[in-house]
């Protein structure tokens, strides 16, 4: 084990000098013995000097401190010992429940599976959320992105997906908290505990208060644990909240490493970093990883380089819209912006496909008519258009749904709606079978039966 010494500290970036013939490799983990800090090598500068990122606070470091090379990348424990535990980026327990028992540790830097090992699946995962199941269904082993600006409900929608899928799902789940609020991580832990599914979940946190090195690598640590379960022939659910903070941590580190920024100040290696993470989140012939990723959209601009780079890696995109949230419709999913590769007659069936498209057609026509209504009022519309507006407003309200995870705030019990009920209900609304009901009856209900019951009380 070769030793070197710190020669420069700039925030989270630390330069370490080793003997020239013992220079550490890129991605090797180094230990600052006195401070108990782990560094990860990012660049070899020359003459035995390496530039590293600190996986923790660099407070108290000084020049001349001794650094040991572990001759291996950062490794985290994988397997059953991680279930029910909260770990940090290094795979160390942070839940004060004793050491983690493990038989294997894996490097957080792995090559993605080879092309001939990949497996495709068209089996649809039922989420119980009407708008998701109808407009952007997702497959087992697929990748789903939840896009939205600040405060439109990404985390709540993700928690509901976890609630509906992970609790019904017999396999294991991995949750990676990347640069999000510690409070949310805490709430999530206790929620899993209360619903008795904690023994099926591994939690890896690198939250907002952590240095950029932790936030940059914590997604990889979580993914390594998920890959471990996948290689045991299991179906794994992988939740990442939030992928944007992974990009942001890369941006913070990139400037300190001396790279020239590219568009909007992002790191020039944005696409490569995103690809390195996303290409590993995939299903093989041994097992599947189904991932749900929250993606923060800066200033509600979907063309920002970070969300735009993420788009290309996903099978389904659920776009949350501020305009819909302002109408009080939650989940605030935009049915015209959200897409899924699974919305194909060969996958979901002709009936489902046609109804989803009919719903989008009605909503699109309503969107076009809004300008006319704003200028001339409803009276100037033809009878046919009036009918479309009426149905569109009912559809819009019926796409809202009370969530189980929001029950404590709203007082409305959460609803799980089966895919069969969802498709049948929207078919009836589009065909005009419920034209006689007031639109308010469709707001915040589960099935169409509840809307009929609600109409009686209005």
UniProtKB/Swiss-Prot annotation:
Question: InterPro entries this protein is in?
Answer: AAA+_ATPase (IPR003593), ATP-synt_VA_C (IPR055190), ATP_synth_F1_bsu (IPR005722), ATPase_a/bsu_AS (IPR020003), ATPase_alpha/beta_chains (IPR050053), ATPase_F1/V1/A1_a/bsu_N (IPR004100), ATPase_F1/V1/A1_a/bsu_N_sf (IPR036121), ATPase_F1/V1/A1_a/bsu_nucl-bd (IPR000194)
Membrane topology annotation: Peripheral membrane protein
One cellular component (GO) term of this entry: proton-transporting ATP synthase complex
The EC class name is translocase
Where is the signal peptide, in residue numbers? Answer: none
Query: What is the protein's major site of localization?
Result: membrane
* UniProt binding sites for ATP: 148-155
Q: What GO molecular function annotation could you give as one example from this UniProt entry?
A: ATP hydrolysis activity
Question: Quick check: keyword Electron transport in the entry?
Answer: no
Q: What EC number is given for this enzyme?
A: 7.1.2.2
Write the record's keywords in alphabetical order, separated by commas.
Answer: ATP synthesis, ATP-binding, Cell inner membrane, Cell membrane, CF(1), Hydrogen ion transport, Ion transport, Membrane, Nucleotide-binding, Translocase, Transport
Subcellular locations according to the entry: Cell inner membrane
Reactions catalysed according to its record: ATP + H2O + 4 H(+)(in) = ADP + phosphate + 5 H(+)(out)
Cysteine disulfide partners in this protein: none
Q: Which domain of life is it from?
A: Bacteria
Q: Which HAMAP family match?
A: ATP_synth_beta_bact (MF_01347)
What is this protein for, i.e. what is its function? Produces ATP from ADP in the presence of a proton gradient across the membrane. The catalytic sites are hosted primarily by the beta subunits.
Report the sequence similarity comment from the record. Answer: Belongs to the ATPase alpha/beta chains family.
The entry describes its oligomerization and partners as: F-type ATPases have 2 components, CF(1) - the catalytic core - and CF(0) - the membrane proton channel. CF(1) has five subunits: alpha(3), beta(3), gamma(1), delta(1), epsilon(1). CF(0) has three main subunits: a(1), b(2) and c(9-12). The alpha and beta chains form an alternating ring which encloses part of the gamma chain. CF(1) is attached to CF(0) by a central stalk formed by the gamma and epsilon chains, while a peripheral stalk is formed by the delta and b chains.
User: What is the protein named?
Assistant: ATP synthase subunit beta
Q: Native species of this protein?
A: Francisella tularensis subsp. mediasiatica (strain FSC147)
